[in-house]
Amino acid sequence: MATRDLPHSVGDFCFGWVDQIRSEITLGKSQDQLIKEDVLEDDETVETKVEIKNLWPAFASGAGLFSDGYVNAGISTVLSCLKKIYGDEFTKSNAMNNIGSIGFVGTVVGQLSFGYISDNFDRKTGMLTANVMLIFFTLMCAVASWGTTVQGFFACLTVWRFFLGIAIGAEYPTSSVIASEFANQLPSGHRNRYFSWFTNAMIDFGFVVSSFVPLVLLWIFTPRHLRAVWRLSIGLGVIPPLILFFIRLKMDNSKSFKKMNMKRVNYSKYPWWLIIKFYWFRLTVVSLIWFIYDFSVYSFGTFNTIIIGEVIPNGTLYENWGWSVVFNLFYMPGAFLGAFIGDYLGPRLTLAIGVGAQGIIGIAMSACLKSLKKHVAGFVVVFGIFSTFGEFGPGNNTGLLASKTCASSIRGQYYGIAAAIGKIGAFVGTWVFPAIQKHYAYSEDLSLQVPFYVSSALCLFSAFLTIFFVPPVGQDAINKEDRLFKEYLEENGVDIRLLGDSGVVTQYQEDEDIGVISDEKDDTVKVQQKNV
């Protein structure tokens, strides 16, 4: 089982992915075909329509990521304002780097710790705790103050930014995981799109709003009152999670978590080694894809600066923030349309198409940088298409792969690890790319082109990993993986009667109490109780 995801021959490596991709494609299949191919849970009824009872919990859980996108992106507004307000006192201090870096650390801590909480305590409890933390620490960042010195204020903001990072990270292995499990209760052929809309599209929408709200506040308060602008920009981020908190109170855990959780398994008997052997390879591949995506995003963002510099060389704060709204809007078409395609072509092929196209366009933009600088309108259009493909492919589907390639028993930890490694990739990018730019400082063009070449090449490598090494991810991937995981644990001597909440009976537990006897004469199947 430790090698189940590895290619078993040269032919399997070269051509095995073709049949796997075909099995994920739903384009052209009728509703009856999708129902026939779908693997259902033991007591699950066939869903043929998207119903609010299943759609609403998926939305309520995933929509919390809007706040994550809003608050996380809103920190850039804070930094912009602090540069204007405090000048060299801020830019030449450690505070500028600390506020950004400490957020990464907090996010990783939140992703890993709440991944464990989500699996071993309760999905809903973890999500509500993350929600409360997000409300509280967002508010603390908005009102941050300590003593009467500027350095005291910087230190206070840094501390609260760390805890806000934990809250943001906590939403990933709780909200996203719950959204994937409720999306799994939707009709086959519709599951991937709703997960993508309620997770990645929510984050992207948060980016858009977080760039537009400061612009509106700037119109109201003018650049003379930037303290009010940045504090209100962050503070308004409290409202969405506050509303969601009361909606989430009425939610319940998903069916798959109730049946598959390992809360009743004693810690000393927890099958850690079996889990590692079963999932090590696919978790490594999914995490590496996420790492590359987040790592590359930093260098891709440098082209924003180039375009703004060419369009408005001496732009005002209004103009700079206005263009920020435009750049963030580029994400939305990719996130929306990619969600549809993810259902029709499957997440692996969709991700590979998106990240592959992004790599090719990125190489072309780098090679033609001098020409593009002279045609700013064309540069903006090409960069917009480039950004759209980023959300169309990896933006939508990295989280989807992380949530559907493992069993419900360990989904929070699995997702949390993959997301944390992705976030580490973003952090590494903030250090690697400036070093590359510094190395090529003698040439303005090379200092911009080389990081883009590196990131674009990694995008193509990511497409290769997705096609050849990620396991099949069909519409019924969650149910299939739950069954395979149960069988694997049972074969290795784990008492699977401990799976699930107390009182929740699975088909496997029923089979322990019911014997199945075949009558050889008429080939009929009779069921009788054991020990009778």
Curated annotation (Swiss-Prot):
Disrupted gene: phenotype observed: Triple deletion of GIT2, GIT3 and GIT4 impairs the uptake of glycerophosphocholine (GroPCho) and reduces virulence in a mouse model of blood stream infection.
Catalysed reactions, as listed in the record? sn-glycerol 3-phosphocholine(out) = sn-glycerol 3-phosphocholine(in)
Q: Which PROSITE patterns match?
A: MFS (PS50850)
Q: How does it sit in the membrane?
A: Multi-pass membrane protein
Organism's domain of life?
Answer: Eukaryota
Indicate the principal place this protein occupies in or around the cell. Answer: membrane
Q: What is the lineage of its organism?
A: Eukaryota, Fungi, Dikarya, Ascomycota, Saccharomycotina
Q: Which GO terms describe its biological process?
A: carboxylic acid transport; glycerophosphodiester transmembrane transport
- A GO molecular function held by the record: glycerophosphodiester transmembrane transporter activity
Q: What induces it, per record?
A: Expression is positively regulated by the transcription factor PHO4.
**What name is this protein filed under?**
Glycerophosphocholine permease GIT4
Show the InterPro entries listed in the entry: MFS_dom, MFS_sugar_transport-like, MFS_trans_sf
Instruction: Give the SUPFAM superfamilies listed for this entry.
Output: MFS general substrate transporter
Does the record carry Transmembrane helix as a key word? Answer: yes
Recorded family membership: Belongs to the major facilitator superfamily. Sugar transporter (TC 2.A.1.1) family.
Q: Which organism is it from?
A: Candida albicans (strain SC5314 / ATCC MYA-2876)
Q: State whether keyword Transmembrane helix applies.
A: yes
Summarizing the function annotation, the protein's role is:
Glycerophosphodiester transporter that mediates uptake of glycerophosphocholine (GroPCho) with GIT3. Does not possess detectable glycerophosphoinositol (GroPIns) transport activity. The expanded ability to utilize GroPIns and GroPCho results from the organism's pathogenic nature and its need to occupy a variety of environments within its host organism. This possibility is buttressed by the fact that GroPIns and GroPCho are present and abundant in human fluids.
Where, subcellularly, is it found? Answer: Cell membrane
Cellular component, GO, one term:
plasma membrane
Glycosylation (residues): N266, N314, N396
Keywords attached to this Swiss-Prot or TrEMBL record, sorted alphabetically, are: Cell membrane, Glycoprotein, Membrane, Transmembrane, Transmembrane helix, Transport, Virulence
Give TM segment ranges. Answer: 55-75, 98-118, 126-146, 150-170, 201-221, 229-249, 272-292, 321-341, 349-369, 375-395, 416-436, 450-470
